[in-house]
């Protein structure tokens, strides 16, 4: 998260800010929900473990984590809706040297669902990584029974299915290069503003 530690992105429907210690307690409450853990493939952690996880993410060079906030005024922790993450790794194809960004998004607060906020948050993190980190390949792994996420990535964002793991009951999708250039390549400047996060 060192990569985005001072980045704040303000867009039409949401604001993205780095995951800070002040966010951990609310994040931990979300992760106490068994359904959220199931859909995100997360383990239950104690509050202390959650603080340690936030600290480790903060120091990692291969993770981008933003907390998704509503655009309304008020205390930041009261505006929290979810998070959006990007895990950066080398391509599994030995002939390719490029980095791949694996995207994850969670809109934990019911008041933030069904409004296009998840779609905007994913578009913002992909656009930011494309422009600032030169990542040109993006993928997502979604459990087969997570219909909202499958719809978001496939129908709304244009990801294409590339594989299925029967062991994990998980579908892997990738974002086609032409979609990245045509939509995400220009999304950030047109629909948002990047500020310094303090």
Swiss-Prot record:
The record's listing under Pfam families reads: Acetyltransf_3
What name is this protein filed under? N-acetyltransferase 9-like protein
Q: What is its EC number?
A: 2.3.1.-
Q: Which residues form the N-acetyltransferase domain?
A: 34-178
Entry-linked InterPro entries: Acyl_CoA_acyltransferase, GNAT_dom, NAT9-like
Record GO terms (molecular function):
N-acetyltransferase activity
Under Gene3D superfamilies, the record lists: 3.40.630.30
Reading the lineage from the top rank, the first entry is: Eukaryota
Could you confirm whether the keyword Transferase appears in this record? yes
Member of which family?
Belongs to the acetyltransferase family. GNAT subfamily.
**Keyword vocabulary terms for this entry:** Acyltransferase, Transferase
Q: Does the keyword RNA-binding apply?
A: no
